[in-house]
Curated annotation (Swiss-Prot):
Tree of life domain: Eukaryota
Originating species: Homo sapiens
A Pfam family matched in the record: P_C10
GO CC list: cytoplasm; nuclear speck
Localization annotation: Cytoplasm
Gene behind the chain: C12orf57
Protein name: Protein C10
Length: 126
């Protein structure tokens, strides 16, 4: 019997939902919440620092969950899991929603620049 780490990780959409839910739940575990808060504090909403501090912690948290499902316990395993989830997002709104929730846990909110006349593009008449 081969070990889980040598088997390719192939999950159905239903299995992907279960794993996504487990990963999201792992972020709310007290020890992981503290690790993420510390990483966010160190990053100070700077995108470069987010990549330096937050992303590695988020990757480690995901690795701990997905290794039980046959993904390698490294960055490549997380990337493979992300690609698998992405492949199901268009077909399954629940997976798309869970994926969005997961990303929101470790990516800063993106603010779009304002558009149109209300954005200060026009000069007020006096």
């Amino acid at each position: 019997m081969a070990s889980a780490s040598t088997q390719p990780a192939a999950l159905s959409a239903e299995q992907a939902k279960v794993v996504l839910a487990e990963v999201i739940q792992a972020f709310s575990a007290p020890e992981n919440a503290v690790r993420m808060d510390e990483a966010r504090d160190n990053a100070c909403n700077d995108m470069g620092k987010m990549l330096q501090f937050v992303l590695p912690v988020a990757t480690q948290i995901q690795q701990e969950v997905i290794k039980a499902y046959g993904f390698s316990c490294d960055g490549e395993g997380v990337l493979k899991f992300a690609r698998l989830v992405k492949s199901y997002e268009a077909q399954d709104p629940e997976i798309a929603s869970l994926s969005g929730k997961l990303k929101a846990l470790f990516l800063p909110p993106m603010t779009l620049p304002p558009h149109g006349p209300a954005a200060g593009g026009s000069v007020a008449a006096s």
